[in-house]
Amino acid sequence: MYSNLPVIPIVIPLLFASITIFFKNNTFIQKQITLCASILVTISAIFNIFKIKKHEILILEMGDWKSPFGITLALDGLNSILVLTSAIVFLATIIYSSKTIDKYSENSFFYTGILLIMTGINGAFTTGDIFNLFVFYEILLMASYLLLLVGIKKEQLKSSISYVLMNVFAGSLFVISVGYLYTIVGSLNMAYISKTISSLPDKRGLYLVGLVMIFVFAMKGAIFPLFTWMNRAYAAPPIAVSIIFAALLTKVGLYSIIRTYSLFYYESNTIKYFLLSLGTISIIVGCIGAIYQKNLKQIVIFNIIISLGIMVAATSVLNSKAIKGVILYSINDILLKAALFTMVGIIIYICKVKNIKKCGLINKYPLLGWTFFITTLCLSGVPPLSGFYGKALIIQGFVEDKQIFVGVIVTLSGLIVFYSLIKVFLNIFYDNTNKSLELKPLPKILIIPVLSLLVIAIVVGLCSNLLEPLLEKSTSTILNSNKYIELVLQKG
């Protein structure tokens, strides 16, 4: 279906970001503008979901330039789900930041950066051509550089160097691979590329480009062995920034892998086993890091690596159960990782500790403690909570593809996730032997985003049968590239 709806989640934050610049010295107005933009994007994303349930895919050809020559925005089940989930996380983050970001950081274009990174993320999810995927990557990266330096502490400056260098290198490789792809196909429209390459007699050059692209997306998604930059970059900035980085930025890399692999490289066993290997090793490395880490932020970061590894490995097998599982698992993971990082921020705010210490918070803050415990169960994949259903489908997908070893690794990773987070729970919340620790009072507004994210994640898991029609459409569009090609090139 032809529609202007796909551009709305991109235009709203971009427009509101430009408005915040005129109120540089009034952070209260900036905050209200950002909150308003986030609410509007959430509403538009919900509306888009209902439209896609009817029409399967929404197409917008910018300037009425026809595919494959013009800029195309294509919103289907997968990216509409990601746009909505991202909007919810942004909304929760803005509420959380209202009490945790200091005035100096707020005056450093914090809210402008939030809106620009929202623009880049939504654009990367929605674009239908490979070059504008690069453009939106650059928008979100420029915004992330700004947010990474909010407050300008020494630790942030150090972490920003590796982050910027990594992205400059990845961006250069991406441009080179896009240019080479254009010389082969003669277009940058994803649907047209997919249609054209299926008839190419010699695909070796194409698969080489594919490996480079997967390498770039793996670097941006922090997949093994390209995740080392993440430990500093995600831990250094204020928690409000880390929430967005941890929950969303890596998912843009994952989405790019899913989209390009399913459209361009699904016939290549080389790329399949390359992805499967990267994903499996990422799970193992993430598990090792999560076990041995004592720093609260680093424990969450290594848990992110585990979940990314699971989703990348599942994407490689490209069957119905695995892809459906990845979509459901990604919704759960985005919401719960955001909730987990928010709770880590609250713990640091209350106790002024960065490592696991005996704080005994359960007596004074029981709601926070039990929310952390339930989040731990969800992320571990304990049935019937939200993390179970997506992971169960992923394991079934591995079994169907005869990747039993990987399925076992994914199953065992749930135990490691549980262990890594329960040690935080037992020490931070239950052990109260440290009597000398002074606890700051907790502003009640900080618990609202945590509870909201957790409740939404649990509802999504328990009511996943209600999402079945949308999940089926999303999976069908990914697995049946001909359907996506037909809908995009014929304008729905």
Where are these regions (language model features)?
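Cytoplasmic juxtamembrane regions at transmembrane-helix boundaries
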Residues: 98-113, 247, 437-446
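Alpha-helical transmembrane segments and their helix-start/interface "positive-inside/aromatic belt" motifs
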Residues: 28-38, 158-168, 365-369, 444-452
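Cytoplasmic/organellar membrane-interface segments at the starts of transmembrane helices
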Residues: 365-367, 414, 418-492
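Transmembrane helix-loop-helix hairpins at membrane boundaries of multipass inner-membrane proteins
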Residues: 1-7, 15, 19-112, 191-195, ...
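Alpha-helical transmembrane segments
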Residues: 14, 35-42, 112-119, 211-213, ...
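Hydrophobic alpha-helical membrane-insertion segments
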Residues: 35-49, 168-176, 452-466
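Hydrophobic transmembrane alpha-helices and their helix-loop junctions in integral membrane proteins
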Residues: 92-102, 108, 118-133, 144-392, ...
